[in-house]
Amino acid sequence: MKCPFCGGESRVLESRPASDEEAVRRRRECLACGRRFTTMERVEVPPLIVVKKDGRREPFNRDKLLTGVLKACEKRPVPMEVIEKLADDIERDLRSSLDREVPSVVIGERVMEALRQVDGVAYVRFASVYREFKDLNEFREQLEQLLKSR
């Protein structure tokens, strides 16, 4: 690697995992000027693109996913660790697929399935917004399906 000070070649003095364990911190020394500097090495993850219902495309945003789940779980006995794990699992699954573009419908369905396992009320809350229930009959049908599956 080139030295940021003089452009000369450098050598690695020390390598160790960074604090987040997702990068490698390397301490280097320039062979030409002798100055030391630190570099960080991370795996480059290609962006995940969400295809919205209207065809628009936008980068995946974990915070949006987390916000939706948090709203569904509001005032429910669902620990934050469970909510974060749910978001992590969904994001990991999406990124591990070979597709770089994911329809928003797929994300919504995965969230609903995960919430169904975690908390029935949170599931129905999320489903009512996600599926845009028009009346009480649609709401009742979803509740009946939930009760049958338990």
Swiss-Prot record:
InterPro entries given in the database record: ATP-cone_dom (IPR005144), NrdR-like_N (IPR055173), RNR_NrdR-like (IPR003796)
Pfam families: ATP-cone, Zn_ribbon_NrdR
Record-level Gene Ontology MF annotations: ATP binding; DNA binding; zinc ion binding
Cofactor note: Binds 1 zinc ion.
Tree of life domain: Bacteria
Gene Ontology BP, a term: negative regulation of DNA-templated transcription
PROSITE patterns, alphabetized: ATP_CONE
Domain ATP-cone residues, every copy: 48-138
Family stated for the protein in its record: Belongs to the NrdR family.
Database matches in PANTHER family: TRANSCRIPTIONAL REPRESSOR NRDR
Family annotation (HAMAP family): NrdR (MF_00440)
Annotated function: Negatively regulates transcription of bacterial ribonucleotide reductase nrd genes and operons by binding to NrdR-boxes.
Protein name listed in UniProt: Transcriptional repressor NrdR
